[in-house]
Amino acid sequence: LKKNMDVEWGYSGDKGPENWASLCDWFARGAEFPLQSPIHLTKGEETKIEGDTLSFHYQKQRFTDKEFKNTIHLVPFDQLSYVEFKKERYYLTDIHFHLPSEHIINGKQEDIEFHFVHMNSKKENLVVGVMYQLMVQEGWLYNQENGESWNLEKHEHWVNPDVFFPEQKSHFHYIGSLTTPPTSGPIQWFVMDHVGKLNQEFLLPFDGQYARPNNRPIQPLNGREIYYFEEFEQ
């Protein structure tokens, strides 16, 4: 099956989400996976309690930014930060964002959703989603006193990915797919329940092309189970 990285796709018109599967065989194969993402997440009687812990082992490291697949990606230079789930390490490979949020929690769509893409030694993906409200006077993402910095001119950033995360990491967990072509699965999805605050100035350098809507519509649940892990404050 030819993986054609040159197939153009987007979020409206002939190349929009409804037509992704018809753009090439690779996308068509991915769309056959029945458990697609994103989905509507709710805490209800049918939500199962998550028994396995997702643990974060992030550290300050160097990233570069790249423009591809209809958004900006922050890509780490080295394999340093990772998460652990069921005794398996998944290293952080990519950070990108979607406007507005792709997942919806309890009926509410947020302004922006960051995706933290991880991969284990078997090339299996685990993605963590974090939602934000865009704010005017608050919600800074980096701490200069900590030696963290963003430099879009040099395409070099020093940051601990943990700054993107809420202190309290209660989250949903389900099996889904990539939300961009080829939308293949299975992928372990974890979506933080706590919504953060992000200063809208974060988006200023990306104004124009990358501050446009790039969210895939909600997909059917198709009978899958949703788990919830509640983290109690220490």
Regions found by a protein language model. Give the residues of each.
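Alpha-carbonic anhydrase
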Residues: 1-234
